[in-house]
UniProtKB/Swiss-Prot annotation:
The gene is fadB. Its EC number is 4.2.1.17, 5.1.2.3, 5.3.3.8, 1.1.1.35. One of its GO terms (biological process) is fatty acid beta-oxidation. The active site is at residue 450. This is Fatty acid oxidation complex subunit alpha. Keywords: Fatty acid metabolism, Isomerase, Lipid degradation, Lipid metabolism, Lyase, Multifunctional enzyme, NAD, Oxidoreductase. Heterotetramer of two alpha chains (FadB) and two beta chains (FadA).
């Protein structure tokens, strides 16, 4: 053994060839600060070996290196800029020394090589991969950019266009694509990986492969003519500006850095990467996006822990076909759980099957599946008008009309047709689960399972625990949601649960602004362009359905009359009374017509102005700051109340539910991350300016206490150790 660290070791293989093996405790390898330091020590040992002829890098895990240790990021990003820059210089010196070894090097890459893992293998001369490879640089999705030389080496290896596509979008690619663009030199079966890598290494040692020529371009300026460079970088900057926008500075910074570094050799190019990385790491956007990643890991880990002792349902059923039922059936079947889809008429069943078939055909058109796979999936969806086969199902989700009487009747009837241990769930969006449970003989086997539309795209499923829902029931439903590829978050029961409970105060803020004379177009523009929502409240209401919102608004008002009961006729009432239900009937705040792709396109409609004039004061202008405050304060206050009342368990789960269920702007990180970034005292000052608008603007006492003591909702993060300590971690 030449060297042994906590996460990697170095040993001789044969005749002057050494292997450097990443083998961290646990299931995966991460390129954390300790591993970077250890890698530097191992390379120091190699540099002393006069008889070294070649080096093989490999992993003892199912994945090569999944990336940097993102749990370190928040503390690392609190280090002063100068110290962070010094540590990056140290880390890059390690990878430079790996690249500069006086012998050929190869990485045998299996599974994931992402972020720092990808940057590590870019420093070797050759890369041989297995078919399960996923390799790329996802840093821009975390609000940063590659910091271990990825923005320098990748463009010089692949050419500017391919590298920009991966780096700016934070993409990873599979084995075939990696081979095609030159990111790896070959792909072999897993059992042949080491044998194949050794064969390449021997050829390089023997002079049959020119490893020095392979290495040279990575250390020189990027080979691009002035015209080629202008075209590549101009197009890339335009595309990034269009897709990422001003709220995500990392992608455009990465492109500009690669452009600026193109004319320099390795050392100066790495300095430019360092100078760009450090300021990004100190942005609120980076902290928010890293926070989302960590919250996502927390939520998924919690679901995994919750379901460790239960079996994933093997057969499911959906009550109520149509678009929602068909979407749920498709998602279950697509992920391998056969499903019975029941309705009371053929027309709805046809609609449900058509929806599932449409989604599968899209996969076929994109080349994701072939005809055989399509037929196989669709054959596991069984439409029926009766309860045939319900005695074999493990779980049933009800997705009928949002009416408590209808839901109770359907659930009670279904309970008599299934086994004693079958779990029942309701896809209600607002009706309290404990109320629906009153119709059942076995309420302990019942809970809520709130999907979001469109089911195949929206990652969140709210799992609602009723008063009598058993732990086993919750675990089984969480297991099914996870199997379906969703992110399940368990919440306690109340009208609207979590997501809709906090959404409708936001809509109430919108209605009050309209009442006071604001223009709905300006509100949408401000909330989209300035705050960052994917769609403004008027457009969102049109997509959700004005009729759906009108009904849900009444349910919420009955559930929380002290805050959500209004004493005036609002814009939603006016549009509902005029049969303007949004996209579903082509008339809402806008008029909708199908575009060339069959998608609804919004157009101005003068008729809506007359309707809104009936429920609004004369038009007046509002500042962007006031619009944002009046929209967001009611929502954030309600989010805080949900935490204080135990409806949602943690700030992390609340923020993920908002991001995954409502599209809360990721660069804000969620309501609690936004609160912490803004500061609770500053938020309180802002909210108090609008408390005259009513109870929705009254800040909960718990948040007032936070403001008094200057306490954040997320645990405070301590800066990482001084840079000198990190080098020897």
């Amino acid at each position: 053994m030449l060297y042994k660290g906590d996460t990697l070791y170095l040993d001789w293989l044969e005749d002057g060839i050494a292997e450097l093996v990443f083998d961290a405790p646990g299931s995966v390898n991460k390129l954390d600060t300790a591993t970077v330091a250890s890698l530097g020590e191992a390379i120091g040992v190699l540099e002393q070996q006069s008889d070294l002829k070649g080096l093989l890098l490999r992993s003892n895990k199912a994945a090569f290196i999944v990336g940097a240790d993102i749990t370190e990021f928040l503390s690392l990003f609190l280090v002063p800029e100068e110290q962070l820059s010094q540590w990056l210089h140290f880390a890059n010196s390690v990878f430079n020394r790996l690249e500069d070894l006086p012998v050929p090097t190869i990485a045998a890459v299996n599974g994931y090589a992402l972020g720092g893992g990808c940057e590590c293998v870019l420093a070797t001369d050759y890369r041989l991969a297995t078919p399960d490879l996923r390799i790329g640089l996802p840093e821009t999705k975390l609000g940063i950019m590659p910091g271990f030389g990825g923005s320098v080496r990748m463009p010089r290896m692949l050419g500017a266009d391919s590298a920009l596509e991966i780096i700016a979008a934070g993409k990873d690619v599979g084995a075939d694509q990696a081979l095609k663009i030159g990111l790896v030199d070959g792909v072999v079966k897993a059992e042949k990986l080491i044998e194949g890598a050794m064969a390449i290494l021997r050829q390089a040692i023997n002079g049959d492969l020119d490893w020095k020529a392979k290495r040279q371009p990575k250390q020189e300026p990027l080979k691009l003519s002035k015209i080629e460079a202008t075209m590549s970088f101009t197009i890339a900057k335009g595309m990034v500006a269009q897709t990422a926008g001003k709220h995500y500075p990392a992608p455009i910074t990465a492109v500009k850095t690669i452009e600026a570094a193109a004319r320099f050799g390795r050392e100066e190019a790495l300095n430019l990467e360092n100078k760009s990385f450090v300021p990004l790491a100190h942005t609120n956007e980076a902290r928010a996006l890293v926070g989302i990643f960590l919250n996502d890991q927390y939520v998924k880990g919690k679901a995994k822990k919750l379901t460790k002792d239960v079996e994933t349902p093997k057969q499911a059923a959906v009550l109520g076909a149509g678009i929602m039922g068909g979407g749920i059936a498709y998602q279950s079947a697509w992920k391998g759980v056969p499903v019975v889809m029941k309705d009371i008429n053929d027309k709805s069943l046809t609609l449900g099957m058509t929806e599932a078939a449409k989604l599968l055909n899209k996969q076929l058109e994109r080349g994701k599946i072939d005809g055989l796979k399509l037929a196989g999936v669709i054959s596991t969806i069984h439409p029926t008008l009766d309860y045939a086969g319900f005695d074999r199902v493990d779980i049933v989700v009800e997705a009928v009309v949002e009416n408590p009487k209808v839901k109770k009747a359907v659930l009670a009837e279904t309970e008599q047709k299934v086994r004693q241990d079958t779990v029942l769930a309701s896809n209600t969006s607002t009706i309290p689960i404990s109320e629906l449970a009153n119709a059942l003989e076995r309420p302990e086997n019942f809970c809520g399972m709130h999907f979001f539309n469109p089911v195949h795209r929206m990652p969140l499923v709210e799992i609602i625990r009723g008063e009598k829902s058993s732990d086993e029931t919750i675990a089984k439903v969480v297991a099914w949601a996870s199997k379906m590829g969703k992110t399940p978050i368990v919440v306690n029961d109340c009208p609207g649960f979590f997501v809709n409970r906090v959404l409708f105060p936001y809509f109430a803020g919108f209605s009050q602004l309209l009442r006071d004379g604001a223009d709905f177009r300006k509100i949408d523009k401000v909330m989209e362009k300035q705050f960052g929502w994917p769609m403004g409240p008027a457009y969102l209401l049109d997509v959700v359905g004005i009729d759906t919102a009108h009904h849900a608004q009444a349910v919420m008002a009955a559930g929380f009359p002290q805050r959500m009961q209004k004493d005036y006729r609002d814009a939603i009432d006016a549009l509902f009374d005029a049969n303007r239900f949004g996209q579903k009937n082509g008339l809402g705040f806008w008029r909708y017509k199908e575009d060339s792709k069959g998608k609804p396109k919004k157009e101005e409609d003068a008729a809506v102005e007359d309707l809104l004039a009936e429920v609004s004061q004369p038009k007046r202008d509002f500042s962007e700051e006031e619009i944002i405050a009046r929209m967001m304060i009611p929502m954030v206050n309600e989010v805080v109340r949900c935490l204080e009342e135990g409806i949602i368990a943690t700030p992390a789960e609340a923020d993920m539910a908002l991001v995954y269920g409502l599209g809360f702007p990721p660069f804000h990180g969620g309501a609690f991350r936004w609160l912490d970034t803004l500061g609770s005292a500053k938020y309180l000052d802002m909210a108090q300016q609008y408390q005259h608008l009513g109870p929705l603007y009254e800040v909960p006492e718990g948040l007032r206490n936070k403001a008094r003591h200057n306490e954040p909702y997320y645990p405070p993060v301590e800066p990482a150790r001084p840079v000198g300590d990190l080098k020897t971690a």
